[in-house]
Design a protein with these regions (language model features):
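Long, well-structured alpha-helical subdomains associated
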Residues: 36-86
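Zinc-dependent metallopeptidase catalytic helix centered on the HExxH motif
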Residues: 1-37, 44, 48
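Residue-level recognition of short, structured coil/turn motifs
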Residues: 7-11, 32-33, 75, 104, ...
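Short catalytic/ligand-binding loop motif for oxyanion handling, primarily in non-cytosolic enzymes
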Residues: 10-12, 89-92
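Short consensus segments that form the blades of beta-propeller domains
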Residues: 13-15, 57-58, 198-202
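Beta/coil-rich, acidic/histidine-enriched accessory regions frequently appended to metallopeptidases
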Residues: 90-284
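Stable alpha-helical elements in mature extracytoplasmic
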Residues: 19-23, 27, 63-66, 75-82, ...
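Structured segments of extracytoplasmic/periplasmic soluble domains
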Residues: 2-5, 27-30, 34, 69-77, ...
Length: 284
C-alpha cells in the first residue's frame, strides 16, 4: 500500500477510500486463487454486500473481484497503470479522484461500455466465471448469492437494505421451470421514493437479465436489457440446475466511489418466482 501511494501519477494527491486495501486483497487473490478458503469470512461479507457501490468502505477487505475482472480483460498491468497514470482529469464533480474514471480513460471506453462491463462482471460473479478463480470458487462460491425483496401482490421490490448503489448489483435466485419454458422479467426502475436514498434521478439506469446454470456447470447468459421500464426473457435450457435474475445499478454518471445513493427497482415475473432459499421475500 505504501509503494502504491508513492507510485501515484499525481504527487500529493491520491485516491480516497479503500482502493489500497482492495488492491492488497487482489494481489493475494492473484497469488492464491483459493483465497475463498483462506479467508471465507471476507467472502461471506462480500456476498451480503454486493449491493454496495464499487469502492465502498465496507467492502475494503471483501471485494477484489472487479480488479480480477479487469485484469482478466486487460492483463494485470491495468492495476499498476491505474495508480501510475492517474491525472487530475480523473476527478468527480465533488473533486475526488476516482479510480473508475481512471480505468475508463485508460481503456478508452465510454460510459455506455463501462456500464455494459459492470453488468457482465456481475453476471459472471454469480458462478465466478473468471479463468483464474473459477475452479477454486466452484464448491463454496458458485450459486450462493443472496438477496431480499418486498412482495406487494404480484410485484417484487428490492428492499432498502439490499438496494444497489453505484455499480452494486443483486443476484436473485429463481425457481427453475420445465426446460423450454420462457421466463420473463417485467422491470420498472424507481426514481421517486422516500424509502431510498435517491440522488440525481435523471442519471438512473439499470441493466438486468437472466443466467441459467446447467448441471455440468456451463452457463447460458440471457440478453440483458437497460430500459427503465422494460423486460428481459430467456428460454430455459435443458438440464438447468440454477436460474438467476441479475440486476446491476449502472448510472449514467460516475459518482464518488463511497457514495451511498441508491437505485431502487421493482418487477414482476412470468413462469418463475424467487427461490425462498437464497432470496428472502417479505410479504406486505
Amino acid at each position: 500500500q505504501y509503494l502504491a501511494l508513492w507510485d501515484s501519477g499525481i504527487k500529493d494527491a491520491w485516491f480516497p477510500g479503500p482502493i489500497f486495501e482492495m488492491t492488497s486483497q487482489w494481489t493475494l487473490l492473484r497469488r492464491s486463487p483459493e483465497w475463498i478458503d483462506q479467508e471465507f469470512n471476507h467472502f461471506t461479507n462480500y456476498i451480503s454486500g454486493t449491493h454496495r457501490s464499487l469502492g465502498h468502505n465496507d467492502n475494503a477487505y471483501n471485494n477484489p473481484y472487479m480488479f480480477e475482472y479487469w485484469a482478466n480483460k486487460h492483463g494485470v498491468e491495468i492495476m499498476s497503470r491505474i495508480f501510475q497514470e492517474t491525472t487530475l482529469d480523473d476527478k468527480t464533480e465533488s473533486g475526488q479522484l476516482n479510480f473508475i474514471k481512471t480505468y475508463k480513460r485508460l481503456t478508452h471506453i465510454n460510459q455506455e461500455q463501462l456500464n455494459e462491463e459492470m453488468y457482465d462482471a456481475a453476471s459472471r460473479f454469480i458462478t465466478w466465471d473468471l479463468p483464474r478463480i473459477e475452479m477454486a470458487y466452484a464448491a463454496r462460491g458458485a450459486n450462493v448469492h443472496t438477496c431480499q425483496l418486498v412482495q406487494l401482490g404480484v410485484t417484487y421490490r428490492i428492499s432498502p437494505e439490499r438496494c444497489p448503489s453505484n455499480y452494486g448489483y443483486n443476484g436473485i435466485k429463481l425457481t427453475v421451470p420445465e426446460a423450454g419454458t420462457t421466463v420473463k422479467v417485467n422491470f420498472r426502475g424507481i426514481i421517486n421514493s422516500s424509502e431510498y436514498n435517491i440522488h440525481k434521478p435523471n442519471n438512473a439506469q439499470w441493466r438486468y437479465g437472466f443466467l441459467a446454470v446447467l448441471k455440468d456447470g456451463s452457463r447460458v447468459y440471457g440478453e440483458p436489457s437497460k430500459e427503465d421500464i422494460g423486460s428481459a426473457s430467456l428460454q430455459v435450457p435443458e438440464n438447468t440446475e440454477h436460474l438467476w435474475l441479475v440486476v446491476a445499478a449502472t448510472p449514467k454518471e460516475i459518482y464518488d466511489t463511497g457514495a451511498d445513493n441508491q437505485w431502487p427497482y421493482q418487477f414482476t415475473l412470468d413462469n418463475t418466482e424467487p427461490d425462498g432459499d437464497k432470496c428472502r421475500v417479505i410479504k406486505k
